[in-house]
Regions:
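Extended, charge-rich alpha-helical interface modules
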Residues: 1-129
Length: 129
């Protein structure tokens, strides 16, 4: 195993995604790997939780919510893609992906600011609103 430095927001994001995978994936072998990674990363996050449990859980809940929405949206898009159904629903869902990714980035940025992360994620996209 290698260890890397990452932003606090990225750590929270990864833990939230692993929590979702733990709920959604049924393959036993995959679940073993997911659980191992989740435990490892959660141990790294314990210090952050001890700083302010309420904020920790709030950030995590918000990331789980937006990442669950992304998971469900992308599942639906894949079904439409498989059926070659490039209709209005497909367009709405495709747009939802980047709207929700923008929300996800905002939450991760808030986490980074709250915990004064030395490493931060930066993005730049064409403005659409």
């Amino acid at each position: 195993m290698i260890e890397i430095q990452t932003s606090v927001g990225e750590l929270f994001d990864k833990i939230s995604i692993l929590s979702i995978k733990k709920q959604k994936i049924v393959d036993v072998e995959k679940l073993k790997n997911i659980e191992k990674e989740l435990v490892t990363l959660s141990e790294k996050a314990e210090l952050l939780k001890s700083i302010d449990q309420e904020s920790f859980h709030s950030f995590m809940d918000n990331l789980i919510q937006v990442n669950t929405k992304l998971w469900e949206t992308e599942d639906r898009i894949r079904i439409l893609e498989k059926n070659q159904s490039f209709n209005e629903e497909f367009i709405v869902l495709a747009r939802d992906v980047y709207f929700n990714n923008d929300k996800r980035f905002e939450i991760k940025s808030s986490v980074n600011k709250f915990y004064n992360s030395d490493i931060v994620e930066e993005k730049q996209y064409e403005k659409y609103i």
